[in-house]
Amino acid sequence: MSASTILVLDTEVKPDYRFLGPEIARHTPGETEYRAFVPDPEPPALEEYAGVVLSGSTASVYDRETHGEWLDPEFDLIRECIAEEIPLLGVCFGHQAVNAALGGEVVGDTRRATFVGMERTGEAPILDGVGAVVPVLHADVVTELGEGMVPTARTAYNEYFCSRHADAPVWTVQFHPEFTAAVRDEPSDWNPGEHGFDDTNSTRVFENFRDQVDRRQ
């Protein structure tokens, strides 16, 4: 492991659905370390990493009774990243977890597995160069941002589709930048609608995150 390693924490609860976490590691430039967090929620030594990415999950952040054994350590990790100013990227469930850990609200919504249109609403280097069409796989949405978080993008159905921390190097996206044609057949309910993968360049998010991490080295 080098001082520039980005840790990818996979928070998927279903082993046979852990196809997206490895894709995050694959699309993130530079050295990465992948770890399935749910089976072993031992807090990582954050000082050993240059940044952290929190993956999506079929779990819900508000289901603490079922998932508290690993959700509580994840929330602690999020708050530690903010306190220590360790670059953090939350993807889908990770977006929800960051906001929930900081006192925001996440609620159940319509299941979506398709491309959606995103509109930028605030400054966010993590979204630089990312087009408006992005893939989503989610059934929960953030309805109230966590303390210190500000909105950076919205959709027709959700005002807080992406966010960032006002002071710490923390960014979150509700969409799945790592979801590409390579894994399009994994979720059984995927329906691209009127768009195709040629219409999106959402993996750019990981290049932008690496750039932000490197700037802080």
Predicted regions and their residues:
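N-terminal beta1-alpha1 cap of cysteine-dependent amidohydrolase-like domains
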Residues: 1-73, 79-86, 191-217
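Hydrophobic/aromatic beta-strand patches that form the interior of the parallel beta-sheet core
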Residues: 7-9, 35, 53, 89, ...
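Short amphipathic alpha-helical segments
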Residues: 20-22, 64-67, 102-103, 147-148, ...
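Secondary-structure boundary/capping positions in well-ordered alpha/beta enzyme cores
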Residues: 30-32, 84-88, 104-105, 148-152
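Catalytic metal-binding/acid-base residues of hydrolase active sites
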Residues: 36-38, 59, 94, 140, ...
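Cysteine-nucleophile active-site neighborhood
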Residues: 58-124
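Pocket-forming structural segment of enzyme catalytic cores
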Residues: 99-171, 175-180
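C-terminal and late-domain segments of enzyme folds
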Residues: 159-217
